[in-house]
Each structure stands twice: as C-alpha cells, then as structure tokens.
C-alpha cells in the first residue's frame, strides 16, 4: 500500500527543544543563553533549580557539551544530589559522572589529586570540622600560655576563619599587626601560625583550608589552573549571594579572566538573589552578587520574578517588607495562582501563650484538612526560642523535630568511633588520636599523654610516632603501667589496620569490639548509654550501606580520572566531615512538625509556616537595631521566612517575653508593621492594658485584676547610663559602658564585660546595676 506524502506526520520537537517545555519566557532565555557570563537573579520560588538543571541538560543536548566539561557548585550535599538526579532524568545516566557538588567537596576532589604540590600534605589528609578545630585550638592556646577563658577556642576559631575567608595566611596576619593592634588581634595571629603548623603536621585541613589551599594551588601553579580551565568550560554556581571572598576568588580562578594563556574564559552562570543574602555572620558578602556585572562587564542579567510556590498574599507581604531595603535591585514577585488565604496574625501575652496558639492551630489544621504534621514548619530567630514551643508541643502530643540541634555525626559516641576510623586512615591525625587515647578508659591518663606530647615536640615527630616510641620505652618520665597501656593501644591499631580491606560496616564492627567501646556501653545501666548503643548500631548500618552504594556506583562506570582512589574508608570519612544541617532535614512523610531557625529554613518550603517572635529586639535582633547594614540583613531574613510558605502563613509576637529570667516588654517588630494590614487576619491584637496590668503573671494581659507585685510604687526606676559608667550584670559581671543609644524604654547600651565580651543590652529589661 502506498503512503501519500501528505499523510506523513510532521517531525516532533527535538530532545533539546523538549527541555524548554513548560518554561516561562525568562526561564527559557536563561536556559539557552550562550556567549557571555550569565547572572540569573532568581526570586524566591521562581523555579531556579528547574532552570539550572534544564540549562545543564541543554548544554549537553543542544550544544554538545561533554559531561566532563561541566562543573556545578551548590551549597549543600542535598541540593547537589537533587540537581544530579534531575539532570539524569532529563538526559540519562551519563549525567551521573558530572561534577555536581558543594564548594568544599569540589575542592576536596581537586586537593586529593594535587596534594603533592602542597608541602607536608598527602592525598589521604583528614578534614577537621568545627569541633576538631576547636580542640586543636584549645591545645595550641594552652601551650602558648593564653588565658583560655579570655581567648576561648570558639573565639579564636571564628577569628581565624574570618582571616581564611579573606585569604589572609598566618604570615600576612602577623605582618599586618601594628602598634594599634589590640590584644585579641595579636593573640589570634600567634595562634593562627601555630595552629596551621599543627594542622600540617597532622596531615589535616580544616573547612576553610579546603577553599584557601585550592585557590593557592591554582594561583601558584598556572599549569594546574589551565588544566581545570580546559576541562571545565562551563561553571554554574547556585546561591551565589552566599559566597564569601575565598569562594569568589575560587570561581574566578576556575573560569579564568582572559586568553593570555591561550585558554578563553569558561562560560560562567551564577544564580542568586541579593534579597536572600542572610549569612554575613558566616563570612558571606552580598557584594559578590551586587558587583557581578562590574566584575564581568559583558554579563547578561535575567530576572526571574514569577513565583511558583506561594500565594499572592504571601508574596505581597514579602515584597512590601523587602522594598524597605535601600540600594537593592528592584524586583517584585508575582504568581498566577491567586490571592489565597490571608496571613494569620496573633498577639500573645507571652512566649507560652504564643506557643499554645501555634500548637492549637497545628492541631486544628491536622485534624480538619488535608494538612499533615510534616507539612508544617515553625521558624524562630534564635535557637533558644524553641524551648517554650517544644514544651507545649510535647504536652499537646504533637510530634516534632528540631533541625540544627545535635546532629547524628556530632554525637559523642559517633565522633569517638569516627575518630578511630580517622586514625586508621591517617595515623598522623593528632587531634583524633588524643581524643581516643583513653576512650574508653585504658589507663593512659593526662600525665602520660602530656609526656608523649612533650616528646613529640622535643624530637620533632608526630604524636602517632611518639606513641610508638612510648610503647618501645623511649619516652622519658612514663611509668611502666602507662607504657604497657600505650603498647596495647598501638598493637590494637596494628591489628585493625590489617582489616582495612574488609567491608566498611565490618570494619566499624571490629572497631567497636576491639576497642571495648561497645562492651563498656553494654555493661552500663544508664538508659542514655543504651541510646548511644542504638546510635552506634545505626553507624554500622550507614557504613554497610555506604560500601554497597560505592560498589554499585563503581559497577556503573569508570572512576573519575581526576580523583585518586583513596579507598572506601577515606571516602566515607570525607562524607561524614562535609555533612551539613540542611542535609539532615527530615524528608516528606516523616510525620513530624519541623522546628528551625530562620537561617536554617533558607532554601526550604512548606505548605504551612509559622514565623514567631516578631518583636524589635527579637526579630530584628537586638544587635541590628542601631546598625543599618545588619538591619538590612535582618529584613532579608524576614523576606526569606515569609517566602518559605506555600499556602498558609502565620505571624505572631509576644507582648512580654522572658529575658535573663526577667519579663521584657517587647515593642512590635518594625517588619510586622511593614506588611500591609489588609493582608493580615488578626486572630488577636494587643489589648489596651489597664493601669496596673500584670506583665508576667498568671492573668491575661489587660485583665482588670491588680498586680500587687507590679504596683506603681514598686516599679523599677528607669535606668539611665552614660558612656564610661561602670555596671554589674547578674551573668556577665563587671562592665563599662561604651555606647548608648535610644531613650526611655528603648534605651540600650553596648557594654564591655572584659573576658565575657561586648554585649548590647536594653537598660530597662536586663539585670544590670549602675555602680
């Protein structure tokens, strides 16, 4: 039978064209753009992940870009995994071999391959997390004779991290000291130098080193930088507004700036939103995204303003709040999904009343609609605000999880066993060695440890080598009992190293048995110790699963030629080190309400969101009230919190909130006043108080019942302070006033409490007495 030409079906869209289906005009432009740097200004909920993944897929399908030529950088492992899976769904399994990872994971891969270029480092280096760094800094501080109470490990760690984020090395920090430098700057510079020396001696890098050392390698060895520029012709960076200076320089080095070396710059695409820049306290600088068009003059900028997450009422509230920030790029989120429900507002008597309202609303939603517990999130400005919420949720029988609490890999028992594994992988890891030397107890006390440490310092060997010497009787001042215990410790590790080829789960089991760690917990009658056993069993399961996943991945295709195979143990330890808060947020279906800070909530979305604590001094935070830069960041935080909600948003504040054990009268947050009132359905507003209204007692605020303890005669007189005044605080002790701002009930001072630090307090609500 003949077929006429007119009967033939027209060709359908190509696979590349199909990638553009369902995108709005701005999203399509972002996907297909080529030839110059691209800045995608992606408003909250505007589909940036879809754009990024479609752009990557389009590079492969339409432009013939190889998988190995693409580098995509995210801020969490969870986001990286989601991006990879989405691209695999669009173009197939080949996308699994694309480099999609966090900044830190990307740098680890580069450094594992280039470790030989860094003096004193080899490819199986340990990665010290915040706790490891603080432990090492405590050792360094004590050895240098510093007052650990005045210069705490946390204070030193933050200061050194800030220097590293600015790519300032120890020599530059020392050289930068002047006659005007304060004691803290001098202490930090001296500690920084010794801290780095000990890190290198332990064959270890901390988080900030991962970025800084990679930048140093790329800048010191042009041929290495050229290699990666040739390889990664397309670099995509998500959440660019959250980058710090070191990350900014890293991206610049990977992309290249000119063709002087014969390699044209790579094609750079960054996605971000200055309105969601909320991590200045971690070193992030909003300038990176605000100045992108100046740094890359031929940039194409595309704004994504159509929102696919929230209702228009929620978006209008967010738009109104963020519009008050000066100097921002004009952008207004909109949706075609309709106005939706009004925002629900509630003014509570105190934090307990606020928590009760939240719990009652959650209970009503879960009982009377399609909303389930895992659809609900409760946000607050600071971690300590969760206490009253947790108490009420427990009484109400509402299941919940606090995100950002003690994470699985931060629990003591997990850290102990991971420390054993790290020593097996890197015998020079002094911090891990000293953590487990007498854990569980095996008769190696502080004095014996100190003798070994002195021997290591005097002979110029590592702590691990000094332990071997101690086992051989070469360390002075050690008694026979300690020598025997150390010899047993060294022998135990020799035996365990013979099992490094075992399945990872079996190796963890062997560590638990051979060290006696499990036996000690099993012998305990403390219920908490039994919970620790459960956690260790979970660690064994995680290790087994990791081994299986790694074997399956290896069977699918060849290993990356740019990354040396450091073994399953090193890979596992790397993953443990780089896990983040956002990677442990419960998945949908967990059946629990999620509690978290506003900072942790960034990047997430929930059908129902409660944002609590809308009070000046709480949100915005007290320290931001007199600082325009910090106040702008607090406003961006409000914008982030509001735009997490998909269907329903609740905002609440308390008239009185406890602070330092005292009731504090809290003015309404200025951010709450910036939301158009027609968008809010106030379930309860602030009643006008009677003259003798209780502010902290059992009665409802505004009740006519007199309060004998708060009568006019017994009220605390208004505290008036001036610069230079000496005061005493119930918690911080003696202090001197440095700055004063505000008047009357709103007056506050910045007070230097010496070793307790500088604290900003409200005169009338803090337990402060003028001397």
Curated annotation (Swiss-Prot):
Activity's dependence on pH: Optimum pH is 7.5.
Annotated cofactor note: Mg(2+); Mn(2+), Cu(2+), Ni(2+) or Co(2+) also support ATPase activity.
Reaction it catalyzes: Couples ATP hydrolysis with the unwinding of duplex DNA by translocating in the 3'-5' direction; ATP + H2O = ADP + phosphate + H(+)
Induction / repression: Up-regulated during mouse infection.
Residues recorded as bearing N-acetylserine in the entry: 2
Phenotype reported upon loss of the gene: Forms small colonies, liquid growth is unchanged. Increased sensitivity to UV light, mitomycin C, nitrosative and oxidative stress; a double uvrA/uvrD1 mutant is even more sensitive. Single uvrD1 mutant is strongly attenuated in late stages of mouse infection, the double uvrA/uvrD1 mutant is strongly attenuated at all stages of infection.
Record keyword Nucleotide-binding present: yes
Entry-linked CDD domains: DEXQc_UvrD, SF1_C_UvrD
Enzymatic class: isomerase
Ranges where the UvrD-like helicase ATP-binding domain occurs: 21-311
Documented EC number(s): 5.6.2.4
Cofactor: Mg(2+); Mn(2+); Cu(2+); Ni(2+)
Positions of the UniProt region annotated as Disordered: 1-21, 691-716
Temperature and thermostability: Optimum temperature is 37 degrees Celsius.
GO cellular component: cytosol; DNA helicase complex; peptidoglycan-based cell wall; plasma membrane
Residues annotated as binding ATP: 45-50, 309
GO molecular function term, any single one: ATP hydrolysis activity
PROSITE patterns: UVRD_HELICASE_ATP_BIND (PS51198), UVRD_HELICASE_CTER (PS51217)
Regulation of its activity: Inhibited by EDTA.
UvrD-like helicase C-terminal domain span: 312-603
Alphabetized Gene3D superfamilies for the sequence: 1.10.10.160, P-loop containing nucleotide triphosphate hydrolases, PCRA, domain 4
A Pfam family it matches: UvrD_C
Subunit structure: Monomer. Interacts with RecA.
NCBIfam families listed in its UniProt record: pcrA
Family the entry assigns: Belongs to the helicase family. UvrD subfamily.
Protein name: ATP-dependent DNA helicase UvrD1
Organism: Mycobacterium tuberculosis (strain ATCC 25618 / H37Rv)
Gene, per the UniProt record: uvrD1
């Amino acid at each position: 039978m003949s077929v006429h030409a007119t009967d033939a079906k027209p060709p359908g869209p190509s696979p590349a064209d199909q990638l553009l289906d369902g995108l709005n005009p701005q999203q399509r432009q972002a996907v297909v753009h080529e030839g110059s740097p691209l800045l995608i200004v992606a408003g909250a909920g505007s589909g940036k992940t879809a754009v990024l993944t479609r752009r990557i897929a389009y590079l492969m399908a339409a432009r013939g870009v190889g998988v190995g030529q693409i580098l995509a950088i995210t801020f969490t492992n969870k986001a990286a995994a989601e991006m990879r899976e989405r691209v695999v769904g669009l173009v197939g399994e080949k996308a699994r071999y694309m480099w999609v990872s966090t900044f830190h994971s990307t740098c680890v891969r580069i450094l594992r391959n280039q470790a030989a270029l860094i003096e004193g480092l080899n490819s199986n280096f340990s990665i010290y997390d915040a706790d490891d760094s603080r432990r090492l800094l405590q050792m360094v501080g004590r050895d240098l004779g510093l007052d650990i109470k005045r210069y705490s490990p946390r204070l030193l760690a933050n200061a050194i991290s800030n220097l590293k984020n600015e790519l300032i090395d120890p020599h530059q920090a020392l050289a930068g000291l002047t006659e005007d430098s304060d004691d803290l700057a001098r202490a930090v510079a001296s500690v920084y130098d010794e801290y780095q020396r000990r890190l290198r001696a332990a064959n270890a890098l901390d988080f900030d080193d991962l970025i800084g050392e990679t930048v140093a390698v790329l800048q010191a060895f042009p041929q290495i930088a050229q290699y990666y520029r040739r390889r990664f012709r397309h670099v995509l960076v998500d959440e660019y507004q959250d980058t710090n200076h070191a990350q900014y320089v890293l991206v610049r080095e990977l992309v290249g700036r000119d063709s002087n070396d014969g390699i044209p710059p790579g094609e750079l695409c960054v996605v971000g939103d200055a309105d969601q820049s909320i991590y200045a306290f971690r070193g992030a600088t909003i300038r990176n995204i605000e100045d992108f068009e100046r740094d890359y003059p031929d940039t194409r900028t595309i704004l994504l303003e159509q929102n696919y997450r929230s209702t228009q009422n929620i978006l209008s509230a967010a738009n109104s709040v963020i519009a008050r920030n000066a100097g921002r790029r004009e952008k207004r989120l909109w949706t075609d999904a309709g106005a939706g429900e009004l925002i629900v507002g509630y003014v509570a008597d105190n934090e307990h009343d606020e928590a009760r309202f939240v719990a009652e609303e959650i209970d009503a939603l879960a009982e009377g609609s399609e909303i389930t517990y895992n659809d609900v999130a409760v946000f607050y400005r600071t971690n300590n605000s969760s206490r009253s919420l947790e108490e009420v949720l427990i009484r109400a029988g509402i299941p919940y999880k606090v995100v950002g609490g003690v994470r699985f890999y931060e629990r003591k028992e997990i850290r102990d066993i991971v420390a054993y594994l790290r020593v097996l992988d890197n015998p020079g890891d002094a911090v891990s060695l000293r953590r487990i030397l007498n854990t569980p107890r095996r008769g190696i006390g502080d004095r014996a440890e100190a003798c070994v440490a002195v021997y290591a310092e005097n002979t110029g060997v590592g702590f691990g080598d000094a332990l071997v010497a101690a086992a051989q009787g070469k360390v002075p001042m050690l008694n026979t009992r300690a020598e025997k215990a150390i010899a047993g410790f060294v022998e135990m590790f020799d035996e365990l190293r013979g099992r490094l080829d075992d399945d990872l789960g079996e190796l963890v089991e062997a560590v638990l048995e051979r060290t006696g760690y499990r036996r000690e917990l099993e012998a305990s009658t403390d219920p908490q110790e039994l919970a620790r056993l459960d956690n260790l069993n979970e660690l064994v399961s995680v290790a087994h699963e990791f081994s299986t996943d790694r074997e399956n991945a290896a069977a699918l295709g060849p290993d990356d030629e740019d990354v040396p195979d450091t073994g399953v143990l090193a890979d596992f330890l790397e993953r443990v080190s780089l896990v983040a808060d956002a990677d442990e947020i419960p998945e949908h279906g967990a059946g629990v309400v999620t509690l978290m800070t506003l900072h942790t909530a960034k990047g997430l979305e929930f059908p129902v969101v409660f944002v609590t604590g809308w009070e000046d001094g709480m949100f915005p935070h007290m320290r931001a009230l007199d600082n325009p830069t910090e106040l702008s960041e607090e406003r961006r935080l409000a914008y982030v919190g509001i735009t997490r909600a998909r269907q329903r948003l609740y905002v609440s504040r308390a008239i009185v909130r406890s602070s330092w054990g005292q009731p504090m009268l809290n003015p309404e947050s200025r951010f709450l006043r910036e939301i158009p009132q027609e968008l809010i359905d106030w379930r309860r507003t602030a009643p006008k108080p009677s003259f003798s209204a209780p502010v902290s007692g059992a009665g409802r605020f505004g009740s006519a019942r007199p309060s004998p303890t708060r009568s006019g005669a017994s009220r605390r007189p208004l505290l008036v302070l001036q610069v230079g005044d000496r005061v005493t605080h119930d918690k911080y002790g003696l202090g001197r006033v440095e700055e004063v701002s505000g008047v009357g009930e709103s007056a506050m001072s910045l007070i230097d409490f010496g070793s307790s630090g500088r604290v900003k307090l409200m005169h009338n609500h803090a337990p402060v007495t003028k001397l």
